Amino acid sequence: MLDSKLKAPVFTVRTQGREYGEFVLEPLERGFGVTLGNPLRRILLSSIPGTAVTSVYIEDVLHEFSTIPGVKEDVVEIILNLKELVVRFLNPSLQTVTLLLKAEGPKEVKARDFLPVADVEIMNPDLHIATLEEGGRLNMEVRVDRGVGYVPAEKHGIKDRINAIPVDAVFSPVRRVAFQVEDTRLGQRTDLDKLTLRIWTDGSVTPLEALNQAVEILREHLTYFSNPQAAAVAAPEEAKEPEAPPEQEEELDLPLEELGLSTRVLHSLKEEGIESVRALLALNLKDLKNIPGIGERSLEEIKEALEKKGFTLKE
């Protein structure tokens, strides 16, 4: 039983960085550490929106299995490097951007070589993309989108221009989440929980921002249980039993003895509290089979007796 006198839990930010955060919530009633920690972990890993590369266009490249003269890496390696690109959209309404890169060798091409774009920040500018030899050139356009979860290349189908290569997109900015539940005490009570959450992100979203978003997502979904209007919209209509014809309505309340059943069958039904035709018709064949003493022959006897009165058992 929940203790109404237990003071409100205290939320503490133990560690907060751009890519790692540790948070503590205590004291909690016994069991609530796991009750809160597990869904928050799942939401953090699956449902926090982020950004990812969704397509790549490279000048003079027809497909991802090509090679580029004067470039050490093949196209597959370049795309794998680009998938590690971490981009932060500073404008919440921004949904997609195209990053442009033009480079000539000899040169090590890094993420910092993309041309600047308003409201866009590259979080890992030292990311290696390609190595150009003397005379090598690399001109590319990289599309970055905002999204949620994992979307394979064939699903999002983004192809802004001919020869653009779609890329599998992992949008989640949360790299890893761990939670730990430990015993804690408050006064004389020693049976309380302390929940510790550790969150790692790619830096495009801070751990605290990710946690706040996860809490809002969980809160929003929990309101569906307490909002009667939402429940009324979502709930399917209850199936209504067809009304019996007026001439049969009176017979529904007849005692079972009026059906002319054998003493053995009648006794088995009455042992289960079935006293009337109406109560018998509320059961289906499976229900009747589960009654001790009611076998296949007894079922046939019951069905025939009901049919004589114009009734049929539910399957």
From Swiss-Prot:
Keyword Transcription among record annotations: yes
Family annotation (InterPro entries): DNA-dir_RNA_pol_insert, DNA-dir_RNA_pol_RpoA/D/Rpb3, DNA-dir_RpoA, RBP11-like, RNAP_asu_C, RNApol_insert_sf
GO annotations of cellular component type: cytoplasm; DNA-directed RNA polymerase complex
Alphabetic keyword roster: DNA-directed RNA polymerase, Nucleotidyltransferase, Transcription, Transferase
Reaction(s) the record says it catalyses: RNA(n) + a ribonucleoside 5'-triphosphate = RNA(n+1) + diphosphate
Region spans: Alpha C-terminal domain (alpha-CTD): 247-315
GO BP terms in the entry: DNA-templated transcription
Annotated stretches, region: Alpha N-terminal domain (alpha-NTD): 1-229
GO MF, any single term: DNA-directed RNA polymerase activity
EC number: 2.7.7.6
A Pfam family per the record: RNA_pol_A_bac
SMART domains, A to Z: RPOLD
Uppermost EC category: transferase
Assigned protein family: Belongs to the RNA polymerase alpha chain family.
Entry remark concerning the domains of this protein: The N-terminal domain is essential for RNAP assembly and basal transcription, whereas the C-terminal domain is involved in interaction with transcriptional regulators and with upstream promoter elements.
Function (record text): DNA-dependent RNA polymerase catalyzes the transcription of DNA into RNA using the four ribonucleoside triphosphates as substrates.
Full protein name: DNA-directed RNA polymerase subunit alpha
